[in-house]
Amino acid sequence: MKVRASVKRVCRNCKIVKRRGTVRVICTEARHKQRQG
């Protein structure tokens, strides 16, 4: 899980999701997981 100021899609499988006020990226590739913080 990467924590970044700006989250971006890395590949076409990445989805940007807002959960409990935080922006997250979920993907089938585990290395692409990010959250904004």
UniProtKB/Swiss-Prot annotation:
Matching InterPro entries: Ribosomal_bL36, Ribosomal_bL36_sp
Entry keywords, A to Z: Ribonucleoprotein, Ribosomal protein
One Pfam short name: Ribosomal_L36
Disulfide bonds: none
GO molecular function terms attached to this record: structural constituent of ribosome
Signal peptide: none
Keyword Ribosomal protein: yes
Record bears the keyword Ribonucleoprotein: yes
GO biological-process terms attached to the record: translation
Entry's family note: Belongs to the bacterial ribosomal protein bL36 family.
NCBIfam families linked: rpmJ_bact
Name by which UniProt lists this protein: Large ribosomal subunit protein bL36
Name of the encoding gene: rpmJ
